């Protein structure tokens, strides 16, 4: 599943925000 990858991507996006 790509949930882990998506979560990581979202976390990075939020961290950059």
Swiss-Prot record:
Upper classification of the source organism reads: Eukaryota, Metazoa, Ecdysozoa, Arthropoda, Chelicerata
The species is: Cupiennius salei
Q: Which GO terms describe its cellular component?
A: extracellular region
Family recorded in the similarity comment: Belongs to the cationic peptide 04 (cupiennin) family. 05 subfamily.
**Superkingdom of this protein's organism:** Eukaryota
Q: Which GO terms describe its molecular function?
A: toxin activity
Q: What is this protein called?
A: Short cationic peptide-5a
Expression tissues:
Expressed by the venom gland.
- Where does this one sit in the cell? Secreted
Tell me which UniProt keywords the record has, alphabetically. Answer: Secreted, Toxin
Q: What is its main location?
A: secreted
């Amino acid at each position: 599943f790509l949930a882990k990858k998506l979560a990581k991507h979202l976390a990075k996006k939020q961290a950059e925000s």
